[in-house]
Amino acid sequence: MIPAVADPTTLDGGGARRPLLPETDPRGRAAAGAEQKRPPATPTVLTAVVSAVLLLVLVAVTVLASQHVDGQAGGVPAGEDAVVVEVAASRGVAEGVSEKSTAPLLGSGALQDFSWTNAMLAWQRTAFHFQPPKNWMNDPNGPLYHKGWYHLFYQWNPDSAVWGNITWGHAVSRDLLHWLHLPLAMVPDHPYDANGVWSGSATRLPDGRIVMLYTGSTAESSAQVQNLAEPADASDPLLREWVKSDANPVLVPPPGIGPTDFRDPTTACRTPAGNDTAWRVAIGSKDRDHAGLALVYRTEDFVRYDPAPALMHAVPGTGMWECVDFYPVAAGSGAAAGSGDGLETSAAPGPGVKHVLKASLDDDKHDYYAIGTYDPATDTWTPDSAEDDVGIGLRYDYGKYYASKTFYDPVLRRRVLWGWVGETDSERADILKGWASVQSIPRTVLLDTKTGSNLLQWPVVEVENLRMSGKSFDGVALDRGSVVPLDVGKATQLDIEAVFEVDASDAAGVTEADVTFNCSTSAGAAGRGLLGPFGLLVLADDDLSEQTAVYFYLLKGTDGSLQTFFCQDELRASKANDLVKRVYGSLVPVLDGENLSVRILVDHSIVESFAQGGRTCITSRVYPTRAIYDSARVFLFNNATHAHVKAKSVKIWQLNSAYIRPYPATTTSL
């Protein structure tokens, strides 16, 4: 049992005592995490009039967002330049989103009364994460490298900031950060994809061809079918034009599979053995008993397909598997390296090679993965641990992260992971700001050879090229209940690397087991335990009325061993009440002799964190209203009741913007 203690206070640099976490910071009704469905949209004559007014507001907000100037002094008081507008009916389906969406289903009533200002809304747009110029975006699709350019396709609604009219947006980059927008790659213009050009994957063939398999939602029945497209000119480095096959659809739902439970084909792989030269493609599904499935098809020409004799894998009770991904991993360096150690998708199974099977679970909107062994003779996959099988074990990310997709980068010989980071604000706020969703920072993926049981994810090494001025804070003592401000200047675009050490005698002196702790059901950073929480507060204002806490929490297990949780607390991230605010996190493996380490990327309304070299990752969408522009701060804190903590090393860099923009027609360089 953890003893009750008084509220923590500390002395800051000026000698004034301040509360670590103020009691007067209501979360709003969304903070409990309940996701409420919207009533069906009902267009009216009034809606048409309101839509016209809304359009004028959106133009103003979009102009402000596009300028993205982060140099204003001080925060913006709530209510100044407030945007007050009725919300037009959603252009999405009745609930306002699709079954492919992970946006919070907030109600249209009392939760939508926050007075957002234009300055607040403009500040939320990210500076170095990928976003389209405007409107709704979801899954990353078909990433690849071609003739000097990285390509990213993505699910996009060109007409609105809500889901609908899904097309394929397209952008290119030399470095995975500085993106140039190209014209649409594919639009819903055939009966087999009239209701949406949904997710898919690219495969590069030995002869240089690039084939793109994608899911289409059909015009008459909204059935999910698989379609083939190829570049009109594969010699074009920008792959600006795509041609859909006359053979489409090339795959339809098989017997026993529901017509809307058959989607998101993987990158094809091939491991030739004897006369078997067929490519394998996996597709996500579920059966009538709600087991999640990965179906496998074999093809020589990507037009004609034969089903494999057995399922690649199935896990009872996990429901529909979306955006299945399947790829090999080799022994890495044991640390989160920026390049190398990746394997091409068709790498042959064998000693030292494992295969990752990942599924995005439609039931809970999280990305789960497992490590196992692939048998190309039977096209089946077996997890190394049944307890850590797909959908019941490890996740890529314990925060807001979904519909991910990897690709192999032949230049730096690495596997790169993309993930969709949806919004957790209201649809009304999305419409006001004119956009919804970002892509995560691309991450390298390696097998963690120190544990052998998990992946390591780390921001691609190119992120370090965005670093500008930096500061170091070494050997900072964090007494129990303390908060220490760090003077880093502008604190809205940051790369933070921190290493913490807990006094060994404090940890050894704890004798009581604490087996009930869980990040998501805890009180967040406000809760006090014997050995935690401690870490950093980012996007915080001076009086800590807004803050996003990234922290460790240590506890003793029943066997006397120390366990380490890594958590991210959004409960006080914003004063706005039209948000879903949660505490995310999970256990993170910490090996003997390792200090506690974390890397944090802060980019306006998104915070991505990587603990212990990327063993556990958490992504949050946060929407500060006070800790914005020059009012954003960074703090160290220790809210433990028993542990003395030292921040051995804290390095913080300001990051430049990526200046994502349309592709210039007169040049092919950045």
Curated annotation (Swiss-Prot):
List of catalytic residues: 139
Family: Belongs to the glycosyl hydrolase 32 family.
Stored Gene3D superfamilies: Exo-inulinase, domain 1, Glycosyl hydrolase domain, family 43
One GO BP: sucrose metabolic process
Species, as recorded: Zea mays
Subunit structure as annotated in this protein's UniProt entry: May be present in two forms, a 70 kDa monomer and a heterodimer of the 30 kDa and 38 kDa subunits. The ratio of the levels of the two forms within cells appears to be regulated developmentally.
GO molecular function, one term: beta-fructofuranosidase activity
Membrane protein topology class: Single-pass type II membrane protein
Reactions mediated catalytically: Hydrolysis of terminal non-reducing beta-D-fructofuranoside residues in beta-D-fructofuranosides
Protein name, per record: Beta-fructofuranosidase 1
Pfam families found in the cross-reference section: Glyco_hydro_32C, Glyco_hydro_32N, INV_N
Keywords from the UniProt entry: Disulfide bond, Glycoprotein, Glycosidase, Hydrolase, Membrane, Signal-anchor, Transmembrane, Transmembrane helix, Vacuole, Zymogen
Annotated substrate binding sites: 136-139, 155, 163, 198-199, 263-264, 322, 362
Stretches in topological domain Cytoplasmic: 1-44
